[in-house]
């Protein structure tokens, strides 16, 4: 992580582009029995968990001005894992987990 920015691992889960703090990533591996699928193991910064995705797109550094918190009203409507913020860049929008 550089000063004033967050380095994110960007993945495509088939529905959205998701970003995970690179410091939290333990390992990325191909999912067994899932051609073209990947399993991202997280847990360096919190509780261990696994995230399945279709593809790993790489990493991106977002500055503080490119990150916006997700309003609580919207977070309540989202089922499953809830993003804490949205990253907005010239390349696209990322849900941050």
Task: Label every model-predicted segment.
Residues 1-97:
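An acidic, low-aromatic, low-complexity terminal/linker signal
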């Amino acid at each position: 992580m550089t000063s004033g920015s967050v380095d994110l691992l960007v993945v495509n889960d088939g529905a959205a582009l998701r970003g995970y703090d690179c410091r939290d990533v333990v390992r990325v591996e191909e999912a067994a029995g899932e051609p073209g699928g990947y399993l991202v193991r997280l847990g360096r910064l919190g509780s261990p968990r696994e995230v399945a995705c279709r593809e790993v797109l790489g990493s991106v550094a977002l500055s503080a001005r490119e990150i916006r918190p997700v309003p609580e009203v919207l977070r309540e409507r989202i089922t499953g894992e809830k993003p804490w913020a949205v990253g907005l860049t010239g390349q696209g929008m990322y849900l941050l987990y």
